[in-house]
A protein has these predicted regions:
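Carbohydrate-associated surface elements
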Residues: 39, 141, 162
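Conserved donor-binding/catalytic core segment of Leloir-type glycosyltransferases
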Residues: 4, 186-202, 208-212
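Nucleotide-activated donor-binding/catalytic signature segment of Leloir-type glycosyltransferases, i.e.
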Residues: 233-258, 266
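Short hydrophobic beta-strand element within catalytic cores of glycosyltransferases
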Residues: 287, 291-292, 296-299, 309
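Acidic donor-binding loop of glycosyltransferase active sites
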Residues: 262-280, 295
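Short His-centered aromatic/hydrophobic patch
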Residues: 86-92, 107
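A short helix/loop element that forms part of the nucleotide-sugar donor recognition site in Leloir-type
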Residues: 169-185
Length: 374
């Protein structure tokens, strides 16, 4: 069965969802789907390199209006599609019930959580989801939120974000030492790495406070923070005021990220809920990237983070990620027991390969869409 993917979020546009869709769909048979998406700088060259068919609208954004319904129906007929796949559920998914063909919806997280908690938008979202043939959810968390919005069970396949386990892998001792040297990190540091956008929901301030609490008893502790964002100046000021053992690395290139993960003793992101639960962690691909590098993880209990980190097996999930003392205790639990940390790192790597390899996930996606044989 051939399908047409309709989305605003597709490469060469850069972002987490764009990367996720690319990693999923580029592994499907190229004759099993086509893509309708919005224009973007450099798209012509990118599209020409692909084995599958891509069309782009003149309008900068795909919105749910009658013209879009006609555009989707026309392209679906032209490419011989049997199914439409809409990403995201809102607002683009509103065209679904008016299409000539059955439609599936892709769900990621925030675009389900926020509308699902507000009465009018919950009703609209529920209508789109109930009319869909099938739902592809990027984790159990958005799947549960979808059924809450729909008011009933839905036909859902969970296809979580994945990780390139060839690109992200454990480092040999010599590689680890060289990576630390390249990042300017002492070889004997008890290194806690945190990589993400610097925004309040990610909990960097709690990690900084926890590191400050441990500084006197663990003089070799270092928290290395990589990334940029609107919270950076506040976080720098907090680290300075607490005399916390923190180093801000700025934005690290994608090529260097596996080396930064791999030279850590543990990875931490204390993600947390905000605005009464309207803002939560969708899944947390950074935890999978750390796991693929054989590094244990410390996560805040928010949204899908507890799916990404298997508590007590691949890392630790902190139930109260706003509490620096609870976070400090989790850090010490890993640093005080290197054997346990190594076991968790090895278990994380094995799980990443077994459950979160993009090849495995793309096969699950393709089967759910009828693009592959069962």
């Amino acid at each position: 069965m051939k399908h047409l993917l309709v989305t605003n979020d597709f490469p060469p546009k850069i972002g987490g969802i764009q990367s996720l869709l690319w990693e999923w769909w580029r592994r499907l048979p190229p004759d099993s789907f086509a893509v309708l998406t919005s224009p973007y700088a450099g798209a012509a060259a990118f599209d020409a390199e692909q084995a599958f068919h891509i069309e782009r609208t003149r309008e900068p954004v795909l919105l749910p209006h009658p013209w879009m319904v006609q555009r989707i129906n026309t392209m679906a007929r032209d490419v011989g599609a049997d199914l439409i796949v809409l990403d995201p559920a809102l607002p683009l998914g509103l065209v679904g019930p008016s299409l000539d063909l059955p439609y599936d919806v892709v769900l990621h997280g925030a675009e389900v959580t926020v509308p699902g908690r507000l009465p009018l938008s919950k009703q609209t979202l529920g209508y789109v989801l109930r009319r869909a043939r099938h739902i592809v959810a990027a984790g159990g968390y958005p799947a549960a939120e979808a059924e809450h919005a729909a008011g009933r069970a839905l036909p859902i396949t969970v296809v979580p974000p994945g990780v390139d386990t060839d690109r992200s892998h454990p480092l040999a001792d010599s590689e680890r030492a060289q990576a630390r040297a390249d990042f300017g990190i002492p070889d004997d540091a008890e290194l806690l790495v945190s990589i993400s956008r610097l925004v309040p929901r990610k909990g960097f301030d709690t990690a900084i406070r926890a590191a400050a609490l441990l500084h006197s008893s663990r003089p070799r502790l270092l928290l290395a923070i990589a990334g940029g964002g609107r919270d950076e100046q506040r976080l720098r000021g907090l680290a300075t005021s607490l005399d916390a053992p923190v180093r801000f690395l700025g934005r690290v290139s994608n090529d260097d990220l596996p080396r930064l993960y791999g030279c850590a003793d543990a990875y931490a992101m204390l993600c947390r809920n905000r605005w009464g639960g309207l803002e939560q962690e969708g899944f947390g691909i950074v935890f999978l990237e750390a796991a693929a590098c054989g590094v244990p993880q410390i996560a805040g209990d928010s949204g899908g983070a507890a799916e990404a980190v298997d508590h007590g097996v691949t890392g630790l999930v902190v139930r109260h990620p706003d509490d620096p003392r609870e976070v400090a205790a989790a850090i010490e639990a890993l640093l005080d027991d290197p054997a346990q940390a190594r076991r968790m790192g090895a278990a994380g790597r094995e799980r990443a390969v077994r459950e979160f390899s993009y090849d495995v996930l793309a096969h699950r996606l393709g089967t759910s869409l009828g693009a592959l044989a069962d």
